[in-house]
């Protein structure tokens, strides 16, 4: 019997704003970066380049704790990366401020959202507290290192095909984490930075965006 799955039937596109990335003094590398990825991070900061991905410590902690919780059973986890897309000196980058997830159906090598939990997921996204954009997704590879499988790559191509979309993969057993984006027929790793809390600046919160969800039978 086909299992109903949700589809976003209405969305609002916003122009990409010119915004400076988080200050360099607020940036730090993830503790689980490989030597190669750490070298790319250091080189980018030394040159003053704009990274393609900045992630709040709050969002990183949620992802890491979720992955670590299921690591003893070697179960994969997943969720959405919520944030904003900006441009600075001609470079488009994404800022992840929070994550969204719900009940999952997972094993040591596969994971997907529980279809019955989609309504709660979208309600939680609406209550996120800021005018978010889906800037990518994350999932774990417990004990399998960090890469995009054929299934992961297909997911990226069909659902996250914009230049700013990121696939974040975390291995809680090997203490590894990497960020990827599409490149040609495949994908490439991109350096990313974590940033700490912002000082209060008096800006008003953005309006919440409501997503209309309609059940659609999967083929």
Please place each PLM-identified region on the residue numbering.
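Conserved beta-strand-loop surface patch within small alpha/beta domains used
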Residues: 1-134, 143-219
